[in-house]
Amino acid sequence: MTQGSRLYFAVTVLMCAFVSINGVGLNDLLERASQLSDKLHSLSTSLTNDLDSHFPPVGRVMMPRPSMCHTSSLQIPNDKDQALKIPEDELLSLARSLLLAWSDPLALLSSEASSLAHPERNTIDSKTKELQDNINSLGAGLEHVFQKMGSSSDNLSSLPFYTSSLGQDKTSRLVNFHFLLSCFRRDSHKIDSFLKVLRCRAAKKRPEMC
């Protein structure tokens, strides 16, 4: 079984785990969510490596700065120590806000992947569709976590995405695809970190053990 097949199998199992959750405790829900977020970040890293395998040098020059990511305006903790100081419901809202913000961008990436000027476009296309499916599954799982936590606040930040095209020429489309993916990879790491902190807190572990 290839690495991609193993990753797909593991994520599929985790997605199915969210289908029937009646009676499942908060600790188990957060464990499943953190495992799925970890797989999501691994998949985005694998996709980035695929793109980098044949990425034109000029693309590095054309690549927008990280501050141009559409989620960069969201105020989030910079490290684990800061995350540990944030209330659980706020931390969960941050993770859910980031997931929601990627619904439209991932739909765009999924629609563009098959026509990229890249020799690995079939693999990239397949993995991008996986990302889109998996982030929807994680979003549904976090809704269950939200309900289980019994929070009275459902304060999700709005992070609109206005781009409907990656560009007209093949280089621009490849560069913008790579840029969006790099933004998602960064955010998927944040989501994974937030969920691991929530899992740690639910298990009543000491902060230094998180």
Curated annotation (Swiss-Prot):
Disulfide bonds join 69-183, 200-210. It is found in: Secreted. It holds the Pfam family Hormone_1. This is Prolactin. Belongs to the somatotropin/prolactin family. Its main location: secreted. SUPFAM superfamilies: 4-helical cytokines. The keyword 4Fe-4S does not apply. Gene3D superfamilies: 1.20.1250.10. PROSITE patterns: SOMATOTROPIN_1, SOMATOTROPIN_2. Residues 1-23 form the signal peptide. The lineage of its organism: Eukaryota, Metazoa, Chordata, Craniata, Vertebrata. GO terms for molecular function: hormone activity.
